[in-house]
Amino acid sequence: MSENLIIFNARIVTPTGTSARKGAEMGQLRIIENGTVEVTKGIITYVGESRGEDRDGYYQHYWHYNARGHCLLPGFVDSHTHFVFGGERSEEFSWRLKGESYMSIMERGGGIASTVKATRQMNFLKLRSAAEGFLKKMSAMGVTTVEGKSGYGLDRETELLQLKIMRSLNNDEHKRIDIVSTFLGAHALPEEYKGRGDEYIDFLIREMLPVIRENELAECCDVFCEQGVFSVEQSRRLLQAAKEQGFLLKLHADEIVSFGGAELAAELGALSADHLLQASDAGIRAMADAGVVATLLPLTAFALKEPYARGREMIDAGCAVALATDLNPGSCFSGSIPLTIALACIYMKLSIEETITALTLNGAAALHRADRIGSIEVGKQGDFVILNSDNYHILPYYVGMNCVIMTIKGGMLYPVN
């Protein structure tokens, strides 16, 4: 199959632009009836109404696909996941059902520490195979770009191993998903540094960041800025050092309590602040003013039985909101794009149009990719999804059920069985 592709007879539905859409802009989509998209060598070269399938034989080396009037959307961007890990934590789910909190499970040695132990015991091939399995499931739900975090090693060897696995998968010539790697060494305090959080931050700054940067293993640096994990000052120190070394910045912020994480993201000019269940009004305003993408993770709130982030208020305050799954082995063992969409509409009060923007262009902006993915426009990558309907309103209507029938990556067609 060729990377040269013509999709015709499509109902094209897309946000537009090369930066995040904020506030009311998020609800503005371009819709083209009976549309055609041309992709040449993986890049979009035409978007518009049909102009005939052959111009002097120009299209003879193109694969033709009749969308039969179905909706054609940009490929989904899952901009916050933890898909490289060992083990599983199903027992913790039953603990939460009995009333234990996320933090209380961490305090008793479960949570992230449990996955760290399992991940440290696995080798490259086993971890890579498991991660590849998750990527295949993501592709079937229309994801064409994903962010993946380290953070289940919390030591030099295993953190680098996670990042090398993501690089290996991203360099696979048969890949269906582009991977943006994030270093999350500050995911939790490892047992060997218990009570010595400042020393662990020193270790990350002096021994991890330079090696990762030199070997181009990650573009972004993230930190779990939360009460009982890493303080605002510790987070600031790590992220400032990362920024000086050329990393883009992301934060796990204000998930458990209002802790000043959103404000810190704005202060440092982070790409995104993620979770934000407890973000303050001041933090929301600061993110809007600074252009920080608010990445919301409704599946995690659902699984933890926590209040949802205030998506509607954030958009109304002028924020750029993205949506992601937060696939991980503990608080959210799900990569369900369909359920993410439904929860965002039902509980975060986003419109269907806003969820599309949040999962495409704004997700791309949260990964510093809005200039090349996230919308169906000339010059961007030929990454799309085709739905099983001409009505994109089915996205939340299909609660937890997949309505994607075709994922297209760089002009390559991948039917969904």
Swiss-Prot record:
Source domain of life: Bacteria
Chief localisation class: cytoplasm
Record Pfam families: Amidohydro_3
Single GO cellular component term: cytoplasm
InterPro entries registered for this protein in UniProt: Amidohydro_3 (IPR013108), HutI (IPR005920), Metal-dep_hydrolase_composite (IPR011059), Metal_Hydrolase (IPR032466)
Keyword Phosphoprotein recorded: no
Residue intervals passing through the bilayer: none
Gene3D superfamilies cross-referenced by the UniProt entry: Metal-dependent hydrolases, Urease, subunit C, domain 1
Residues binding Zn(2+): 80, 82, 252, 326
Catalysed reaction, written as an equation: 4-imidazolone-5-propanoate + H2O = N-formimidoyl-L-glutamate
Coiled-coil annotated spans: none
Cell compartment(s), UniProt: Cytoplasm
Keyword flag Iron: yes
Described function: Catalyzes the hydrolytic cleavage of the carbon-nitrogen bond in imidazolone-5-propanoate to yield N-formimidoyl-L-glutamate. It is the third step in the universal histidine degradation pathway.
Protein name: Imidazolonepropionase
